[in-house]
């Protein structure tokens, strides 16, 4: 009933923090499953049936990777583990007091088989063969991440132009200015 009457639906998603067997994130708790819990994906699918804009706020120590979330959520706010001031920061973003301008500090895999996933990591066992013999991707998915390092949206629009670097080549310990 509440979803039917709402203009927008905000869903809180993520893992259960802790140190015991009931936790799905926390110190020393690892998982090979990188999607949302199945019950949360079912909840998203049920809420999507009402055809209202859905915003997901994701609380976890790892980024969200979910086909269901990708397909049905209008926006995802990656809150990580926000601590004491997190609630105020999230409310300020939702009400437009501040603009969500953060960028992802990691690339987010589509599925666990892509991990590790970063910009210059060789892909699979045939990566050295390239596209010349048909091994350009995994069998089930491409090599592209769900969300790339640095991905993020904002309420505003930004344009970068006339970008220049101070040196065309740098050594590993040198700095450049952009």
Predicted regions and their residues:
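Hydrophobic helix-and-loop "lid/oligomerization" segment in the mid-to-C-terminal part
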Residues: 1-71
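Secreted, periplasmic, or luminal enzymes acting at the cell surface/secretory milieu
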Residues: 59-178
């Amino acid at each position: 009933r509440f979803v039917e009457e709402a203009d927008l639906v905000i869903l809180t998603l993520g893992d259960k923090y802790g140190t015991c067997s009931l936790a799905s994130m926390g110190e020393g708790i690892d998982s090979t499953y990188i999607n949302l819990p199945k019950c949360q994906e079912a909840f998203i699918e049920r809420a999507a049936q009402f055809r209202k804009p859905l915003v997901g706020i994701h609380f976890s120590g790892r980024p969200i990777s979910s086909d269901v979330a990708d397909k049905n959520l209008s926006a995802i706010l990656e809150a990580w583990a926000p601590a004491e001031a997190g609630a105020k920061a999230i409310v300020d973003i939702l009400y437009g007091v501040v603009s969500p301008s953060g960028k992802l500090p990691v690339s987010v895999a589509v599925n666990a088989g892509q991990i590790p996933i970063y910009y210059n990591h060789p892909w699979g066992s045939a990566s050295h063969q390239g596209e010349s013999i048909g091994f350009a991707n995994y069998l089930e998915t491409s090599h592209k991440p769900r969300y790339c390092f640095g991905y993020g949206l904002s309420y505003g629009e930004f344009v970068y132009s006339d970008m220049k670097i101070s040196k065309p080549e740098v050594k590993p310990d040198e700095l450049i200015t952009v």
